[in-house]
UniProtKB/Swiss-Prot annotation:
Gene3D superfamilies, sorted: Metal-dependent hydrolases, Urease, subunit C, domain 1
Family statement drawn from the similarity comment of this UniProt entry: Belongs to the metallo-dependent hydrolases superfamily.
TM helices/strands, residue ranges: none
Matching CDD domains: Met_dep_hydrolase_A
InterPro entries xrefs: Amidohydro-rel (IPR006680), Metal-dep_hydrolase_composite (IPR011059), Metal_Hydrolase (IPR032466), Metallo-dep_Hydrolase (IPR051781)
Protein name listed in UniProt: Uncharacterized protein Mb2939c
GO molecular function, one term: hydrolase activity, acting on carbon-nitrogen (but not peptide) bonds
Length: 370
C-alpha cells in the first residue's frame, strides 16, 4: 500500500463540532471540541467541521519504532517525518517498542501523535540487529538495565526474547528463567509493563511464567504456551504484516540452514498459531513493526491482516482503536479526553482503502485534512 500524501493543518479553531455515527457503539453522536478537549455537552459558537459519516477515536499502532532506521538511530527530523506519516493515516497513539533515538522532544510538537515509549531494546552481544539494542555483556545485568529503561520509557520495557545464536545455528532464548523473573519483577515494581520480541517456541515459557505482560510476534506459539498466556493474562501483538518478511530472512541465511528452515516453518504456521491464540481468548492488538524494514503508515494493512485470523472487520478495527486504547490506558471519545479522533465519509470497516484515508483527522483539537 502506498504512503498517502501528507495532510496539512486545516484549522486551529478553538471551538469545533462534529456529528456522525460513533464507533464502536454505532450510535449517533455529537461532540464539541474546546481547547483541545472533547465535550459531550453543546458549546456555543462551535464551528461544525464534519457532519455525517463515521467518527472514531484515533487509531493505535501498538508496535512501531519512531526514531529507528535500517541501521539504528536516525536524526530527529527523520523521526518527526515518521510520526507525521502515522498521523496522516490516522494513527494518533503509538506504542514505540524500542528506539535508539531520544524522541522525547517530539512531545512538544502538538501536531504529532502521542508516543508511549519502551526505551531501548535490551539484548545480548550479537544477539539482535546491530545498532538497535543496549547489549548486556552478562545476563545478570538485565534487572538493572530494565530499571533504567523503565525510567527512560513511558511505562513499558522491551526485551529481545530470542534471536539467532550463531554457535548453534538456530533461534534460541537470550535469558535464563530466573533472570527473567527478577527483571520483570523489577519493572513491575516501578509500575512498568514488559514486552518481548519472540519468533520461536523455546523462549515463550520462561517469559510467560516470569509474568511478562505482552508478546510481540508470537509465531512460535504452541497450545501449551497459549494456555500459559491465558493463565497469566498475557497479551499478543502479532505484527502480521511483518510475517511476510520471514521467507526473505530465510533466503538470506544460507550459512545457517537449520535457522532458515525454522523461519520458513514459522512463516507457514504463523497465521494459524496467532488464530489459535485469538480463538482461545488471548487479547490480540494491532501493531505493524514499522521502522527499519516495515514502512510507517501501514496500520490499515495490519487491520486487514487481523481478519485473516478470524476477527470480524469490527473486531480488527477495535484491535487498532478502542480496544487497544483501553489496554494502553488511554481514553477514546470520552468527555474531557484529548480531542484525538478521526472522521470518515464511508465506513472505515470496509477495508484499508477507506481506513487509510480519513477525511478529517483531529489531533489535540487541531484539524488536518486532505
Amino acid at each position: 500500500m502506498k504512503r498517502v500524501d501528507t495532510i496539512r493543518p486545516r484549522s486551529r479553531a478553538v471551538r469545533l463540532h462534529v456529528r456522525g455515527l460513533g464507533l464502536p457503539d454505532e450510535t449517533a453522536i455529537q461532540l464539541w471540541i474546546v481547547d483541545g478537549r472533547i465535550s459531550t455537552e453543546p458549546v456555543a459558537g462551535a464551528d461544525t467541521v464534519f457532519d455525517g459519516g463515521w467518527i472514531l477515536p484515533g487509531l493505535v499502532d501498538a508496535h512501531c519504532h519512531v526514531g529507528l532506521g535500517k541501521h539504528g538511530n536516525v536524526e530527529l527530523d527523520e523521526a518527526i517525518a515518521q510520526a507525521e506519516t502515522e498521523r496522516d493515516v490516522g494513527a494518533l497513539l503509538l506504542r514505540d517498542c524500542g528506539s535508539p533515538t531520544d524522541t522525547r522532544g517530539l512531545d512538544d510538537h502538538e501536531d504529532l501523535p502521542r508516543i508511549i515509549r519502551a526505551g531501548r531494546h535490551l539484548a545480548r552481544p550479537k544477539r539482535y540487529i546491530a545498532g538497535f539494542a543496549v547489549e548486556l555483556e552478562d545476563e545478570s545485568q538485565l534487572p538493572a538495565a530494565v530499571a533504567e529503561q523503565a525510567r527512560r520509557g513511558d511505562g513499558w520495557v522491551k526485551l529481545v526474547g530470542d534471536w539467532i545464536d550463531r554457535q548453534i545455528g538456530d533461534l534460541a532464548p537470550l535469558w535464563s528463567d530466573d533472570v527473567l523473573k527478577a527483571a520483570i519483577d523489577t519493572a513491575h515494581a516501578q509500575g512498568a509493563r514488559v514486552t518481548a520480541h519472540v519468533f520461536s517456541e523455546d523462549a515463550l515459557p520462561g517469559l510467560i511464567n516470569a509474568g511478562i505482560d505482552c508478546i510481540e510476534h508470537g509465531t512460535g506459539l504452541t497450545d501449551d504456551t497459549i494456555a500459559l498466556m491465558l493463565e497469566h493474562g498475557t497479551a499478543l501483538v502479532p505484527t502480521l504484516i511483518n510475517l511476510e518478511n520471514f521467507p526473505g530472512i530465510a533466503d538470506a541465511a544460507g550459512r545457517y540452514p537449520t535457522y532458515a528452515a525454522h523461519m520458513r516453518d514459522l512463516y507457514a504456521r504463523g497465521y494459524g498459531r496467532v488464530a489459535a491464540a485469538r480463538e482461545a481468548g488471548v487479547p490480540v492488538y494491532a501493531g505493524t513493526d514499522a521502522g527499519s524494514t516495515i514502512e510507517h503508515g501501514r496500520i490499515a494493512d495490519e487491520v486487514a491482516a487481523l481478519q485473516r485470523i478470524g476477527m470480524t472487520a469490527h473486531e480488527a478495527l477495535g484491535a487498532a482503536c478502542w480496544d487497544a486504547r483501553r489496554w494502553l490506558g488511554r481514553p477514546g471519545l470520552d468527555d474531557r479526553a484529548s480531542a484525538d479522533l478521526l472522521c470518515y465519509a464511508q465506513d472505515p470497516r470496509q477495508g484499508p482503502g477507506v481506513l487509510q484515508h480519513p477525511d478529517l483527522v483531529i489531533l489535540r483539537g487541531r484539524t488536518f485534512g486532505p
